[in-house]
A protein has these predicted regions:
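ABC transporter nucleotide-binding domains
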Residues: 1-621
Length: 621
């Protein structure tokens, strides 16, 4: 066995608050070996990120380590150090140097006021005894290693290919300017994937022994996620680093981890080799996490959730009691049922018709005039039948969200037609447009920013009723709100609480209840589960399907996660650069994708299958 570089023993972390104490970590233990990747997986609130912050010595007040040890070996054959007992000044010598961390949201991790070069150089000089010019070269080398910058040879080749008359003596200067131009760029000028590469370059710039990656790909598209995972894996192997990879998605863990620790409510409930965890999970929580992710190979009527595998209750003394359950096998939707459903839609008149729709955003010139338009939606046409779910997939920037908001007239189109129930609504204004809002609703991506934090949940759900004068009395409206909250799986007394008092999944249920308040016919779900843990995501997806059946709803389901879209959709449109590049039934798109772009999206989905786990281990060998 390889040398142990980090060993956590019986670690306990508590957060005292208002006379109550929340135990975020309850005696967790694990070991990390040189060159190994340990995956830590669990839902929000399980203690994953608190574990990382405790190792880094970055726990926020009032969080405190109340017990246990964190033993770190800074050099081979050196004595281990207990990081818990290390004075803050000595801890600073290791943090960012020997132990580095990549955070979940790169945009909030970088200072928008400074260019990326300044921030990289600052981090390097803080941990290494080098001059500013040396730090600059290390920063450039780091950006090349994470493939944000091409190598010197590739830059030279680019210049020689674009200009046959180029003076070779000018190449060194051009290469230098090209590299320095990247250092001069600011965070807002880079995409999410590029920003995460900057964060990775910063983390590895001081040659850490341990790299902690806390949900480093959660905010990224599946294709960008796949390239970042491959990059992290490559860097780890080339540098022989030990790595802790934290995520809520077991599918991702299967792509990168050698060992896995599954966390639930501050405890490690199962741990072992990655292939063992995926081929033969023992704990009901692990089984639930694996089962709740939509499969590309099967089409169940509903997804299994963690609650199908276990129940958890706290005793009067605060002891957590987990009771395993045997889940009922999910009923598969047959090929005949799918064909009959599609045939039924084909016989119906469209509810929504889109004809040659174009949406552009003006690019301003130096003097404020419009130079040109950036076409977010460029000549899109399709129909949506009553009762069906049309999936809309593509990477960030492909135009899917702009298209969804344009259909609701939240963004004005440049040209084309939006026809709803045989009425052209493209130019509707005033009262006719307001009446249309009753029929067409949207559930946004982030449930927290969708709800006013100053409004009680009941008032938020009631607001559409007041705007459209629905319900004769306040009592009638409150009864309607209570009915809606109960229908989405919340108690009626939830109407007296504020958004911050709910979990992410519960907040999204509130948003769904609000979208149903006016009995709409058509709802756009815009990345409405992408901000949720996979287990909560499964619950919300099941709810959306139930509501569609109960209320005869028509959905457009927008997402970058193709496995989720396949579970939800009857037909799928694939968007790229403002255009529909492929469309068909959900089954045909997945079984026989025609376009290379669609094939790339499908190949990038982390499945968590035993075969993918075995392939990962073969690559590692």
């Amino acid at each position: 066995m390889r040398e142990t570089v980090l060993e956590v023993r019986n670690l306990q972390v508590e957060f005292p608050s208002d006379g109550n104490t929340v135990r975020a970590l309850d005696g967790i233990s694990f070991a990390l070996h040189r060159g190994e990747t340990l995956g830590i997986v669990g839902e929000s609130g399980s203690g994953k990120s608190v574990t990382a912050l405790a190792v880094m010595g970055l726990l926020q007040t009032p969080g405190i380590v109340t017990g246990g040890e964190i033993w770190f070996r800074p050099q081979e054959n050196a004595n281990s150090i207990d990081l818990v007992k290390l004075p803050p000044k000595q801890m600073q010598l290791h943090r960012g140097g020997d132990i580095a961390m990549i955070f979940q949201e790169p945009m909030s991790s970088l200072n928008p006021v400074y260019n990326i070069g300044f921030q990289l150089i600052e981090a390097i000089m803080r941990h290494q005894n080098v001059s500013a010019s040396q730090a600059k070269q290390i920063a450039i080398a780091g950006l090349q290693e994470v493939k944000l910058l091409p190598s010197d040879e590739e830059i030279q080749q680019q210049y020689t290919e674009t200009s046959s008359k180029l003076d070779p003596s000018k190449l060194p200067r051009l290469v230098k300017e090209h590299k320095e131009a990247m250092l001069e760029r600011y965070p807002h000028e880079l995409s999410g994937g590029q920003l995460q590469r900057v964060m990775i370059a910063m983390a590895i710039s001081c040659n850490p022994l341990i790299l902690i990656a806390d949900e480093p790909t959660t905010a990224l598209d599946v294709t960008v996620q796949a390239t970042i995972l491959e990059l992290i894996r490559e860097l780890q192997q080339n540098r022989d680093m030990a790595m802790i990879f934290i995520t809520h998605d077991l599918g991702l863990i299967s792509e990168i981890a050698d060992e896995v620790a599954v966390m639930y409510r501050g405890k490690v409930v199962e741990s072992g080799a990655s292939d063992q965890i995926f081929s033969s999970p023992q704990h009901p929580y692990t089984k639930g996490l694996i089962a709740c992710r939509p499969s590309l190979d099967r089409r169940p009527q509903k997804l299994l959730t963690v609650s199908d595998y276990m129940s958890a209750e706290e005793t009067a003394t605060g002891q957590l009691v987990i009771q395993a359950k045997e889940p009922a096998q999910p009923i598969e939707v047959t090929t005949e049922e799918i064909a009959a459903r599609l045939a039924n839609f084909n016989e119906k008149e469209p509810l929504l018709q889109i004809r040659n729709l174009k949406v552009g955003f003006p690019v301003r010139g130096v003097f404020g005039g419009t130079k040109r338009y950036n076409m977010a939606v460029n000549g899109v046409s399709f129909d949506v039948k009553p009762g069906e779910t049309l999936g809309l997939v593509g990477e960030s920037g492909c135009g899917k969200t702009t298209l969804g908001r344009t259909l609701l007239r939240l963004i004005e189109p440049m040209s084309g037609q939006i026809i709803f129930e045989k009425q052209d609504i493209t130019s509707l204004k005033g009262e006719p447009l307001q009446k249309l809002r009753r029929e067409m609703q949207i559930v946004f991506q982030n449930p927290f920013s969708s709800l006013d934090p100053r409004m009680k949940v009941g008032d938020a759900v009631m607001e559409p009723l007041l705007i459209h004068s629905v319900g004769k009395t306040k009592q009638k409206r409150r009864e309607r709100v209570a009915e809606l909250l109960e229908r989405v799986g919340l108690n009626a007394d939830a109407m007296n609480r504020y958004p911050h008092q709910f979990s992410g999944g519960q907040r999204q249920r509130v948003c769904i209840a609000r979208s149903l308040a006016l009995n709409p016919k058509f709802i756009i779900c815009d990345e409405s589960v992408s901000a949720l843990d996979v287990s909560v995501q499964a619950q919300v997806l099941n709810l959306l399907k139930e509501l569609q059946s109960d209320f005869q709803l028509t959905y457009i389901f927008i997402s970058h996660d193709l496995s989720v879209v396949k579970f939800m959709s009857d037909r799928i449109l694939v968007m790229n650069r403002g255009q529909i590049v492929e469309q068909g039934t959900a089954e045909s798109i997945y079984q026989n994708p025609k376009e290379e772009y669609t094939q790339k999206l499908i190949a990038a989905i982390p499945t968590g299958s035993a075969e993918r786990v075995r392939n990962h281990h073969l690559r590692a060998l």
